[in-house]
From Swiss-Prot:
GO terms for molecular function: ABC-type transporter activity; ATP binding; ATP hydrolysis activity; ATPase-coupled lipid transmembrane transporter activity. One of its GO terms (cellular component) is type I protein secretion system complex. Residues 155-437 form the ABC transmembrane type-1 domain. It comes from Mannheimia haemolytica. This is Leukotoxin translocation ATP-binding protein LktB. Residues 469-704 form the ABC transporter domain.
């Protein structure tokens, strides 16, 4: 009745769903009591105020259909008749709109005509204040500004060294001018000796300062590199499970590896070339003093470099994008192939995999070659401009010398100064591919660093878990356009109770435990532990107090002891051994040559499946969690290992709430209560013998199948 009553107020339903989308929990009845004063549903003003009270930033706008693809989705399409609905995605290529019908509680795909018929032009954009803060800290080139400010002292030292280098670069041409115009004409050997010694001193200082600048600059950029690498890894581990489930492993690895491109850019010569270019204005002033005409030729060449770069850059960027996509495909396929090597060999499909790899590799090489060709064209274009300017300057300079407007020494000095101006431009133009590549890398890496992490609403300082669990009116789906996985699930689990959950595959058993671990926030309803809403809890606080054993567990390439004591490396050995005994792992560990110091190999490859599973069980037990989840944990065990664990089950369950998910009913028959699920709903619950009395029930049917 409560759900139906809320369904009548589609504005309240929409607010609930959008709040859950932004990881914010709310009590619909409380919102209704505060803001629906006349009982007719939330008005537009009341809706905006209610959103503000939930720390949501909501904005009512009017937007033409042709511009809907530019707004942040999901958003609420507000209708004056109260028939509001959610706009989830705009497919501009096919003119389709993915919406969520709040009245029917189901996603819908509307054509252009269908959407135009129901769209009245009003939209409410919703973002969480946490996401707004996140946007302000968005990772792009501006991310490096605070880093530069942080190390401003070091960069100031680099700037001072650069000034001295430019002064030395300015002095050298003047020495050559004096030699040409004075020394050679007047045969001044003493002056020549003095200039030679002075020039040698300048060269020595220039070499020392240049090396010092490179050292200081590399030292500071290495610090920034370390900060970025540390930030990236911390952020990666704090991303929600959904991020990894929606992306290929190889694609994520490829994006992380883009850090290498940024690192090479920071530690290379590109940024020092930019510094050198900034000092070109001083050289231009001196060059103008020598010859305004020759200086205008140099100045006139600069727009040519810029226009050439503007012409090449968009094409180069597109081809770099294509190259990255092909590289990411190769990375993903390689990771998939290596991790699936047992299946590949068992099914003898190596030729098919090789054929696929050859095609993907050919595609990557082709895209890489196109990038190289275009980069070469860009560099040769720069060389053409440079050579053309050199020829013009030679012709014009010779005319000025012949006419007496310029001496030979001044012409040589001018050419040396122009070289100091053009050299940074040439280096930057030749490094333009690196600039484009690092821009792509920042964008790709930004996909990781700009993805929202698991948010901690309120960061409540909650006490130690006791073990009472409550699922209230839970409705959940993994994506807005995906089918409902859990539908109106209500379940109370008392502290210390052992609960078995059974049902067909896809009935929602494992999804319940994922909600309990706060991997996801339910679309509707609340998950409570000891009366505390998990949507408001710190996920790390929660997960440290829940032990989980899955059907397929991953062990790290460390010793058995380190794997068991993963959450606390300094854990006493006695606790490790006790947990191993409870899990039935101590005996086989003791028989190993290195015992608990045995390295298990990557993902536990050095152990059998049953041995890996028992170590995983010991790892879940070692922290003495108040809530323990066994998700098909014994299905991979042989009967002897399972028998050992089942014998210890009473000790394992003592003093904690236990949830056993299993297909084999023998695993759960001794549970205090058995929950039977079908199509996302609880259809039966009771003890083993009670459920068998219902001969028409699903549990009896599954039991009969296993007996047969």
């Amino acid at each position: 009745m409560e759900a139906n009553h809320q369904r009548n107020d589609l504005g309240l339903v929409a607010l609930t769903m959008l709040a859950q989308y932004h990881n914010i929990s709310l009590n619909p009845e409380e919102i209704k009591h505060k803001f629906d004063l006349d009982g007719k549903g939330l008005s537009l003003t009341a809706w905006l105020l209610a959103a503000k009270s939930l720390a949501l930033k909501a904005k009512h706008i009017k937007k033409e259909i042709s511009r809907l693809h530019l707004v942040n989705l999901p958003a609420l399409v507000w209708q004056d008749n109260g028939k509001h609905f959610l706009l989830v995605k705009v497919d501009t290529d096919n003119n389709r709109y993915l919406t969520y019908n709040l009245e029917q509680d189901a996603p819908q795909i509307l054509s252009q005509d269908e959407f135009e018929a129901c769209y009245q032009g009003q939209l409410i954009l919703v973002t969480s204040r946490a996401s707004v803060v996140g946007q302000l800290a968005k990772f792009d080139f501006t991310w490096f500004i605070p880093a530069v400010i942080k190390y401003r002292k070091i960069f100031l030292e680099t700037l001072i060294v650069s000034i001295f280098l430019q002064i030395f670069a300015l002095i050298t041409p003047l020495f050559f001018q004096v030699v040409m115009d004075k020394v050679l004409v007047h045969r001044g050997f003493s002056t020549l000796n003095i200039i030679t010694v002075a020039l040698a001193i300048v060269i020595i200082f220039e070499i020392v300062l240049s090396g010092l600048r490179t050292y200081v600059f590399s030292h500071s950029t290495s610090r920034i590199d370390v900060e970025l690498g540390a930030k990236l890894f911390r952020h990666l581990l704090s991303l929600p499970i959904s991020y990894f489930e929606n992306r290929r492993v190889g694609d994520t690895v490829a994006r992380v590896r883009e850090l290498d491109q940024i690192r090479n850019f920071l530690t290379g010569q590109a940024l020092t070339s930019v510094l050198d270019l900034l000092f070109s204005f001083i050289f231009f002033a001196v060059m103008w003093y020598y010859s305004p005409k020759l200086t205008l030729v140099i100045l006139g060449s600069l727009p040519c470099y810029i226009l050439w770069s503007i012409f090449i850059s968009p094409i180069l960027r597109r081809r770099l994008d294509e190259k990255f996509a092909r590289s990411a495909d190769n990375q993903a396929f390689l990771v998939e192939s290596v991790t699936s090597i047992n299946m590949i060999k068992a099914m003898a499909v190596a030729p098919q995999m090789t054929d696929t790899w050859d095609k993907q590799l050919a595609s990557y090489v082709s895209s890489s070659f196109r990038v190289t060709v275009l980069a070469t064209i860009g560099q040769q274009g720069v060389q053409l401009i440079q050579k053309t300017v050199m020829v013009i300057n030679l012709w014009l300079g010779a005319h000025l010398v012949i006419s007496g407007d310029l001496s030979i020494g001044q012409l040589i000095a001018f050419n040396m100064l122009s070289g100091q101006v053009i050299a940074p431009v040439i280096r930057l133009a030749q490094l333009w591919q690196d600039f484009q590549q690092v821009g792509i890398s920042v964008t790709r890496l930004g996909d990781v660093l700009n993805s929202p992490t698991e948010q901690y609403q309120g960061k409540l300082s909650l006490p130690e878990i006791k073990g009472d669990i409550s699922f209230k009116n839970i409705r959940f789906r993994y994506k807005p356009d995906a089918p409902t996985i859990l539908n109106n699930v209500n379940l109370e689990i008392r502290q210390g109770e052992v609960i078995g959950i059974v049902g067909r595959s896809g009935s929602g058993k494992s999804t319940l435990t994922k909600l309990l671990q706060r991997f996801y926030i339910p679309e509707n309803g609340q998950v409570l532990i000891d009366g505390h809403d998990l949507a408001l809890a710190d996920p790390n606080w929660l997960r440290r107090q829940i032990g989980v054993v899955l059907q397929d567990n991953v062990l790290l390439n460390r010793s058995i002891r380190e794997n068991i004591a993963l959450s606390d490396p300094g854990m006493p050995m006695e606790r490790v051994i006790y947990a191993a005994k409870l899990a039935g792992a101590h005996d086989f560990i003791s028989e190993l040559r290195e015992g608990y110091n045995t390295i298990v190999g990557e993902q536990g490859a050095g152990l059998s499946g049953g041995q890996r599973q028992r170590i995983a069980i010991a790892r879940a037990l070692v922290n003495n969690p108040k809530i323990l989840i066994f998700d098909e944990a014994t299905s991979a065990l042989d009967y002897e290992s399972e028998h050992i664990i089942m014998q210890n089950m009473q000790k394992i369950c003592q003093g904690r709430t236990v949830i056993l998910i299993a297909h084999r009913l023998s695993t759960v028959k001794n549970a205090d209560r058995i929950i039977v699920m079908e199509k996302g709903e609880i259809v039966e619950q009771g003890k083993h013998h009670e459920l068998l009395q219902n001969s028409n029930g699903l549990y009896s049917y599954l039991h009969q199948l296993q007996l047969n």
